[in-house]
Amino acid sequence: MKPVFLFLLSFFISYASYAQPYVSYITGNAGDMITSPKGGICLMGGATEDDHAMRWFLQQANGGDILVLRTTGSNGYNNYLYSDLGIDVHSVETIVCTSPAAAYHPYVLQRVAEAEAIWFAGGDQWSYISNWRNTPVDSIINTMIAQRHITIGGTSAGMAIQGGFYFSAQNGTVTSSTALANPYHSLVTLDSSHFIAQDVLRNIITDTHFDNPDRKGRLMSFLAKIYEDYGVFAKAIACEEYTAVCIDSAGTGRVFGGWPATDDNAYFVSSNCELSQPAPENCTPGQALTWLRGGMAVKACRIRGTANGANTFSIPNWQGTGNLSWFHWSANNGVFIEQAGTAPQCIPTAQHFPSAKSPVHVYPNPFDKQVFVYTDKMDASTVSIRIVSLQGQIMPIPALDVFENGWMLNTQSLAPGIYFLSLFTNGEMYTNQILQKVSE
């Protein structure tokens, strides 16, 4: 039986005096169908949806319920997903979150928990981030990914939010020329704060509409800035507008598109692991990017997108098969350079350190008898802490010790399972941590 998220009233705004913060459109059966989804991720470039990729997405739901999440628009996906593609599903529901309060509404949370597949529509990724990050919505989505292996997909902004690193577009979009001229321009807003947790995309940033306009230069700038700010040699997956990458549970991405009739491609990009000194030569505020390394700073694999998705790329092994070409990318004083390249003779790896932007940290996780919670941006004396079960029950957890910026909690009384960690301070609630209790 699926969990129903009956969060206590203290978690929510009282809706009695407010308009409903969402609009729901249901096609098919309104009740819940319990199936076993197959997992996976569908990343789509942002123009018209690729029908073959969307059929893959629906098949991963295994006949279950499809949920479309968006903050603007209407029900344009409903008939398309329910009947036009010829894949049987139980229902398609679009929920338009018209207010940030929707992220706390019991109906929205229940429907998120019941979905076998969730599709993020295009739109404004900052709207998604600012409305859903650190709320029960993203906590439940991530729990369902981890527990039930639901399938996640999205186009344009809905693709842009799915990497462990992401371009938030908080101040608007940015062109390649602007990002190359100054990787620290106010429009280059990159983030790694916990949002959509896909393990295979943990050290990856995605980019969309990659050929309209050409975004190779800005992606180079993104990767350089991530290294400078986070100490991580991140990787990237980019889709041209009519291309999709559908990633199965083993981490293999099939590339869908219209090749050879149309020039549809996806790119898999990483720093050059063959170099002893791979870091950018100059990535500093107010200056043009230089990441040259003999013209071999970055390796990019271009894969043609076809109707049957026959050309593939293994993300764990960072190797492709089928119709593909390798390129070397570099940047010299803000000028992007592309030349023919070779496949890497090594597997790129990423050093990853906890983000300094995350306000809450937990160790260990999964946990057993004790768990240490600390905050590097909040005074523990001003914070109240809760651990809440999947059923919405607040668990009585005595603090063993209180430190200046954290607690050691006694968790022996908790049964094994998934819990939400919430902290309250200065009128704000943080729900960006999911805890797992293992058997003692």
Identify the residue ranges that each predicted region occupies:
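Sec/Tat signal peptide C-region and signal peptidase I cleavage site
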Residues: Y15-A19
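N-terminal beta1-alpha1 cap of cysteine-dependent amidohydrolase-like domains
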Residues: P21-A121
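C-terminal and late-domain segments of enzyme folds
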Residues: Q20-G63, V174-P348
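Glycine/threonine-rich flexible loop motifs
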Residues: Q125-T135
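C-terminal outer-membrane/trafficking sorting elements
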Residues: P354-Y363, F367-E440
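Bacterial N-terminal signal peptides
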Residues: L6-S14
